[in-house]
C-alpha cells in the first residue's frame, strides 16, 4: 500500500554524564548515522530500513515513501563519528515514530522523533555536581 509519504526528523546528542536525559554539558552529534526500522507488530523480518546522517546541528531527516500502519517503526542509533561518545545503550538508543495517516496526527507528513543519545564510556568529572543540581531524589509519595 503506497499511501502518502512521511519525513521523519529528530536529533542525536551525546550524553556525557550517562544521565539518560540532556544536561548543560550534552551536545549534538554531527555526522551520526541513524536508521528507521519498521517491523510487523507480531515480530518478524524488518519491512523497511532507511538510513540518514545528522547535520551540523545533530538533526536528521529520513524520507519514507509509504504508510506503515501495520508495523512498529523506530529510529535507531547506528554509528557515532565521535569516538569519545559512541556507546549505545539498549532500549535507550531508539525512538518510536508512527508512520501512518490513520492515527489522528495532523502534521502533514512530518513525524518528529524524540531525541536519542550516544553515551560516553566514562562520565565527565563534573557530572556528579551537575546531576546533584538536578536534585534527582524521589518525589514524595502522594497520600
Swiss-Prot record:
Keywords: Allergen, Disulfide bond, Glycoprotein, Secreted. GO terms for cellular component: extracellular space. It holds the Pfam family Pollen_Ole_e_1. It is found in: Secreted. The keyword Nucleotide-binding does not apply. Glycans are attached at residue 24. It comes from the Eukaryota. Belongs to the Ole e I family. This is Pollen allergen Phl p 11. It comes from Phleum pratense (Common timothy). The lineage of its organism: Eukaryota, Viridiplantae, Streptophyta, Embryophyta, Tracheophyta.
Amino acid at each position: 500500500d503506497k499511501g502518502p509519504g512521511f519525513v521523519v526528523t529528530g536529533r542525536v546528542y551525546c550524553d556525557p554524564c550517562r544521565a539518560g536525559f540532556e544536561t548543560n554539558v550534552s551536545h549534538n552529534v554531527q555526522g551520526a548515522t541513524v536508521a528507521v526500522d519498521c517491523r510487523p507488530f507480531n515480530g518478524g523480518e524488518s519491512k523497511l530500513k532507511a538510513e540518514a546522517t545528522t547535520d551540523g546541528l545533530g538533526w536528521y531527516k529520513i524520507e519514507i515513501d509509504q504508510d506503515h500502519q501495520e508495523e512498529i517503526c523506530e529510529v535507531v542509533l547506528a554509528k557515532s563519528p565521535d569516538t569519545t561518545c559512541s556507546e549505545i545503550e539498549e532500549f535507550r538508543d531508539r525512538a518510536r515514530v508512527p508512520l501512518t495517516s490513520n492515527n489522528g496526527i495532523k502534521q502533514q507528513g512530518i513525524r518528529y522523533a524524540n531525541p536519542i543519545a550516544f553515551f560516553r564510556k566514562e562520565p565527565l568529572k563534573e557530572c556528579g555536581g551537575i546531576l546533584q543540581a538536578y536534585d534527582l531524589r524521589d518525589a514524595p509519595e502522594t497520600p
